[in-house]
Amino acid sequence: MTLEEARKRVNELRDLIRYHNYRYYVLADPEISDAEYDRLLRELKELEERFPELKSPDSPTEQVGARPLEATFRPVRHPTRMYSLDNAFNFDELKAFEERIERALGREGPFAYTVEHKVDGLSVNLYYEDGVLVYGATRGDGEVGEEVTQNLLTIPTIPRRLKGVPERLEVRGEVYMPVEAFLRLNEELEERGERIFKNPRNAAAGSLRQKDPRITAKRGLRATFYALGLGLEEVEREGVATQFALLHWLKEKGFPVEHGYARAVGAEGVEAVYQDWLKKRRALPFEADGVVVKLDELALWRELGYTARAPRFAIAYKFPAEEKETRLLDVVFQVGRTGRVTPVGILEPVFLEGSEVSRVTLHNESYIEELDIRIGDWVLVHKAGGVIPEVLRVLKERRTGEERPIRWPETCPECGHRLLKEGKVHRCPNPLCPAKRFEAIRHFASRKAMDIQGLGEKLIERLLEKGLVKDVADLYRLRKEDLVGLERMGEKSAQNLLRQIEESKRRGLERLLYALGLPGVGEVLARNLAARFGNMDRLLEASLEELLEVEEVGELTARAILETLKDPAFRDLVRRLKEAGVEMEAKEKGGEALKGLTFVITGELSRPREEVKALLRRLGAKVTDSVSRKTSYLVVGENPGSKLEKARALGVPTLTEEELYRLLEARTGKKAEELV
């Protein structure tokens, strides 16, 4: 490559990277994946190293992020600069990082490092004076960010006041959206036909930039902190000499600190931690796109200093990009339990994150228009939140002209009824649509709803075909003679199913509300509604104002719930369920026997896991999905997963199922059978 060719390519890359910086940092709406962005930055960096005369202080390789050009929040200048991190993509590059440290310090390693998960969120800076939070701001370009104090304060774990800290203090961290909250939010947005978020990082950024803090508060944001700006030297003088100790100091001061950090010696030690965490990546409750490796000894940080863009004492060791190219072969349309029609893309099968992917949701009309996706397109796919296959972007440069636009059906693909269009959402209004009935019963019987074991998809189809059930209330009218004789259904199987159906009557209001599929009502909201109203009769008479008082309920959701509660067909369904003996009262709270305790469950229990979780919550405990230092007990069933290993590493006490029930008996004076 000649100098002129290099100059032309460097200018192209700089313009392209600046554009994508603006999309990512300012609009929180990136058009390319992190892996593609890293490739562009890497190409630019290599060209600048090969042709030093092309280096420039305004190059993206010398800068962090993008200045908030059209900020909707007040710009604030950080007292000390917030840097980005350089990246390593393989062990050789990690080793090269250690060798640079050795040369700069004039001595051989190995050195001690602190290794932390690189939480994929939005970097923030909290500024305190005399222990009082003055403001919180986004990173922006590293020198100027946007003040987002009110929105940050909707995260309950962020301290407003501190004791025993330097007079002026900056605390740095990451605001993120847990995967579970991200999936729930996208489900709600999709249901309303609104634009969904591409990943948890975008969802966190978009939520933190809301003008109304009440919206931010309902998004389930979390924060983790890991560094100091102003005030670090004073803290060092107090005896905090390492990054590992600094993380402990932050925890002692009340800041949430991501629990999975570790010490390692030398590049080989870091590699061992990296490989271990890479395997466990999808067990994390948040998205992590790598690990952050920092020299542990803080005194060495000052010796090494910074480049224009990043510290020399730290590096981001990125996980491999889990994205694949494939073709969209066709689009089919599915009808859900609410009648909403969802397009599903049929892909040339690809292997992604341990499983074959051949279908991908295309969500709604807004999503298809935004992507400009067509049948025959080459697409880049990944798993959103590490769970759901999703199209990341369309590879338009590979179009041949033979691609076809996606046409929405005018009639229901299941029953032929003419579809209604509500904004960008297409719905089948036919109450007798077989697809709506099937999905409603399948959801009602699912594990987190009424948990009717043995009522699988094939059996639901047969019950509908034979006219034995038309809706969920009909399940409670089934008799043994109705079931015996159905394909693969003998007398014993029929008895077992009827026993499961009978037991489901006692699940309580919380599970019933989730099972009935009220609009926008997931597990958390069902729990909140049950706690607020106590029984179905009171909920049926709720006003809009009363619904808006419920935690996690916004105005759109409240109006949709109210419309359903007033619907005569819904009220008739509730009446028939009540006549069948389905309990419609919230489960008795059970006092505060376990208040202040946090439980996590792993492995198979003798009782349904959701039943045990509900019992623990009724007794005042908190039940989470991941083990941390805040976990009081890990309940261990048969065939436990990686949570057991993590609990042992953190020193978290474990209980067998039998030991758990003994603990409950000691705390409540009742046996487990009496409590369930």
From Swiss-Prot:
Pfam families: BRCT, DNA_ligase_aden, DNA_ligase_OB, HHH_2, HHH_5, Nlig-Ia. One of its GO terms (biological process) is DNA repair. Residues 589-676 form the BRCT domain. The active site is at residue 118. NAD(+) binds at residues 34-38, 84-85, 116, 139, 174, 294, 318. Gene3D superfamilies: 5' to 3' exonuclease, C-terminal subdomain (1.10.150.20), 6.20.10.30, BRCT domain (3.40.50.10190), DNA ligase/mRNA capping enzyme (3.30.470.30), Helix hairpin bin (1.10.287.610), Nucleic acid-binding proteins (2.40.50.140). Disulfide bonds: none annotated. Its EC number is 6.5.1.2. It catalyses: NAD(+) + (deoxyribonucleotide)n-3'-hydroxyl + 5'-phospho-(deoxyribonucleotide)m = (deoxyribonucleotide)n+m + AMP + beta-nicotinamide D-nucleotide. Its cofactor is Mg(2+); Mn(2+). The keyword RNA-binding does not apply. Zn(2+) binds at residues 412, 415, 428, 433. It is an enzyme of class 6 (ligase). Keywords: DNA damage, DNA repair, DNA replication, Ligase, Magnesium, Manganese, Metal-binding, NAD, Zinc. InterPro entries: BRCT_dom (IPR001357), BRCT_dom_sf (IPR036420), DisA/LigA_HHH (IPR041663), DNA_ligase (IPR001679), DNA_ligase_AS (IPR018239), DNA_ligase_CS (IPR033136), DNAligase_adenylation (IPR013839), DNAligase_N (IPR013840). The keyword Magnesium applies. Coiled coil: none annotated. One of its GO terms (cellular component) is cytosol. CDD domains: BRCT_DNA_ligase_like, LIGANc. It comes from the Bacteria. One of its GO terms (molecular function) is DNA binding. HAMAP family: DNA_ligase_A (MF_01588). Belongs to the NAD-dependent DNA ligase family. LigA subfamily. DNA ligase that catalyzes the formation of phosphodiester linkages between 5'-phosphoryl and 3'-hydroxyl groups in double-stranded DNA using NAD as a coenzyme and as the energy source for the reaction. It is essential for DNA replication and repair of damaged DNA. This is DNA ligase.
